[in-house]
Amino acid sequence: MAAAAAAATEVVIEVKNLHTRFGSHVVHSDISFEVRRAEIFALIGGSGSGKSTLLRELILLQKPSSGTVRVLGADLQALGADEAVALRRRWGVMFQHGGLFGSLDVLHNVGLPLREHTVLDDGLIDQLAGWKLAMTGLAPEVGALVPAALSGGMMKRASLARALALDPELLFLDEPTAGLDPVSAGGVDALVLQLRALFGLTIVMITHDLDLLWQVADRVAVLADGRLQAIGTMPELAALDHPAVRPYFEGARGRAARPADPAHPANPAREPSSKPK
């Protein structure tokens, strides 16, 4: 019991006094937050609010101008090249547009991280890649398809399977439901919750999807004007009278996404389903 409580409060990501500038343009100004073990943490904000830049800084694709970013106990600014490679093996990333290579079939796309970071033989890599596809709800025959033959929902699942290839403890999701119909999006909702429940994954996601936020997010951080404007659960944010937060809960879309009972889905067409579309 004590071990479980300690894990729940363990800090997996710590951002302190983060500043990011491109010339005279300020992207982030004094941003600080923490993400705890096995938490589903969401970043939201309008276009140009710095969400994508922040994600890039968290996954070692970009350096902030100043401040501290610690991920899985490591200070990202202090890492050597070999340390950075080792740390990247401990997380997975699902990019917004999938990031799958069009010239490779799905099975080989999913197996790429294993080929890059392990010395396993090709047969075992293919077997492991097949297991990851099954884990995300895709049938074995999907592995033989090229990405162009996949539906939007299948593409998201295949991309997620690749992000899971190295059994990460931390998962980054960039707009995981973007472009999906409600049924397919509901499948992603269910899958995110299942992955956390089964493997204790810590999940950080960027999304504009209010239904997804209500369904799965433990806490949500709101970025606007280069600053972290608010952070809390969806019910806490919904009750907050803040100019950067209110637009997410006002208007037809905000009201439609908000459940009468936060414990139940607001949109019956969007109830979580594990069936891929």
Language-model features: locations:
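Conserved catalytic motifs of ABC-family nucleotide-binding domains
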Residues: 167
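Conserved ABC ATPase "signature" region
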Residues: 75, 123-141
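Conserved ABC ATPase signature
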Residues: 146-150, 154
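Helix-to-loop junction immediately C-terminal to a conserved catalytic motif
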Residues: 59
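Catalytic Walker B motif of ABC-type/P-loop ATPase nucleotide-binding domains
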Residues: 171-174
